[in-house]
Amino acid sequence: MNTALAQQIANEGGVEAWMIAQQHKSLLRFLTCGSVDDGKSTLIGRLLHDTRQIYEDQLSSLHNDSKRHGTQGEKLDLALLVDGLQAEREQGITIDVAYRYFSTEKRKFIIADTPGHEQYTRNMATGASTCELAILLIDARKGVLDQTRRHSFISTLLGIKHLVVAINKMDLVDYSEETFTRIREDYLTFAGQLPGNLDIRFVPLSALEGDNVASQSESMSWYSGPTLLEVLETVEIQRVVDAQPMRFPVQYVNRPNLDFRGYAGTLASGRVEVGQRVKVLPSGVESNVARIVTFDGDREEAFAGEAITLVLTDEIDISRGDLLLAADEALPAVQSASVDVVWMAEQPLSPGQSYDIKIAGKKTRARVDGIRYQVDINNLTQREVENLPLNGIGLVDLTFDEPLVLDRYQQNPVTGGLIFIDRLSNVTVGAGMVHEPKNEAAVASSEFSAFELELNALVRRHFPHWGARDLLGDK
């Protein structure tokens, strides 16, 4: 039994009242990243321990596991709370992305513990894709390392605007203010090259001893700032998608009987309300929203992030992968785009290759036209390469088999984020963030109807021996 949880339930007046209170708390998704052995898993274990989120049987098991697999001598090895794979415990490292959940009186949290080894950079990118804040751990003895730079760049590339630089293991440098100041200046020098307007904060701490994690450290009187937990509880997260135009990717056509046809999905951005005039892309057909159906009943309006089913006043042809948006918005379909890519496969990405891609519920095919550059993570410079290797990050030009409706990833991660799928093995081999959609298709779309463009793409895909010309360009 978790005595802290039992006390919270008692204070709220019962389980139902406690659950209602939990629903109204804000949620923060964050990840821990940095170089190997910087103490990421230990930090999460310390957060769970000091916020009293560990059940008594877990604590008892942790004592036994610390004796068997622990790396901290007689002390509790808090990293074992997160490192669940047998290989992780044997090697004392994190391999997979581990998710943990906890809450305080002020906020709920979802933590993604990501691996520090370079060969698991792809796992780190997966964990960062859903987070709003990144905790970058730096070993006070080692300072800023290559993997620290790599994870910082990937975090900002994936749209994370809030970075908390946690300078860990301060106990091993005698809680030196000089060491903290030097590392802080080194990181700020590097961070000046990172894209975007970033909110960067620094906290000196010791995850092993608990200094400045959930309570102020008595050993660092020179630091008067907030603890790590206080930063997490008070940071203001402004979701970009709330202020963006309406985007509703259709994931499923719900047809339980002859009297109901609804289009289910998650509202990617903006808001939608009953009576609103909407447009379906790529067909361009317009209709009005008749109902907004949810698990809890009909609603008059819905907001970004909510799972809903839309019922329209007209029966029109809509299928999985189509996109609904406000009728008065002009968003041309494009057939090519420049995409920031994090490559995740042993086989490198090379020009001329074709892959299946998935974006916002739609599956199609894309060809790699060229690689503009690969980013050198050490100094964030760009260099020309012939292919993009495993864990490589670069800007790639893609051409799609059919016109797609895309947003820039920084504006909308749902309609601007895609994955590459190997056509033979069906394995995900890369992640892409749309850098800039190319508008050549806008001209062609004005010359040909949506039906003509779709028919042209269908003929070229299934009957290539006919030699049909691409209506969107000579390809």
Swiss-Prot record:
Q: Where is this region: G3?
A: 113-116
* Region described as G1: spans on this chain: 34-41
A biological process (GO) annotation for this entry?
hydrogen sulfide biosynthetic process
Alphabetically sorted, this entry's keywords are: ATP-binding, GTP-binding, Nucleotide-binding, Nucleotidyltransferase, Transferase
Query: Where does the chain bind GTP?
Result: 34-41, 113-117, 168-171
The reaction(s) this protein catalyses:
sulfate + ATP + H(+) = adenosine 5'-phosphosulfate + diphosphate
Q: Which segments carry the region annotation G5?
A: 206-208
| The keyword Nucleotidyltransferase is annotated on this UniProt entry | yes
What NCBIfam families would the database entry show?
Answer: CysN, PRK05124.1, small_GTP
Quaternary context: Heterodimer composed of CysD, the smaller subunit, and CysN.
Q: Name the chain's protein.
A: Sulfate adenylyltransferase subunit 1
- Recorded source organism is Shigella boydii serotype 18 (strain CDC 3083-94 / BS512)
Q: What is the taxonomic lineage of the source species?
A: Bacteria, Pseudomonadati, Pseudomonadota, Gammaproteobacteria, Enterobacterales
